[in-house]
Amino acid sequence: MASQQMSTNNAQMSAQQAAVLQQTQAQQLSQQQDFDPVHRFKMLIPPLKDSLQNVMTIASLNFAHNTAIDNGLKTTEKGNDAAVQRFDKSLEEFYALCDQLELCLRLAHECLSQSIDSTKHSPNLVPTATKPDTVQTESLSYSQYLSMIKSQISCAKDIHNALLECSKKIAGKGQGACN
């Protein structure tokens, strides 16, 4: 009896732990997707379609209203104009969504450029502790990675010092050339 109760308690605890783990993973995935520009872009497409449809609907209603006024079927009374929706507000909403989409695309392009540059300048990866079962054949050890980073920092400092020296020579001579 006691062993059955312990096994059910253990099963309940493992089920609770699994549920908590799933919830944590879902939250992490959601947070990653919030910062992913491609995911954000995909999420903005349906509101953009709705906004465009709204702009076209309001434009057609305003066009029909103005045509009726031009043909003399309606008069330009204050109460009549209140029923017509504001085209400029709906167009502004559409442009705001377009601007957000543009920013998402620029951010995605910048992320891609950084990824390409990172791969070009540091093609070998450092193995991560999160995935011990996967073996990376072309990975660097941590000490190799540190030495590579130190050499990159040293190179950047050398370039910085050369530029400083050149600027001092130019400032000192007025119009001298750098060697």
From Swiss-Prot:
Keyword Transcription regulation: yes
GO cellular component, one term: mediator complex
Signal sequence, renumbered to the chain: none
Pfam families noted in UniProt: Med29
Matches recorded under InterPro entries: Mediator_Med29_met
A Gene Ontology molecular function term of the record: transcription coregulator activity
BP terms from Gene Ontology: eye photoreceptor cell development; regulation of transcription by RNA polymerase II
Homology family: Belongs to the Mediator complex subunit 29 family.
Name assigned to this protein: Mediator of RNA polymerase II transcription subunit 29
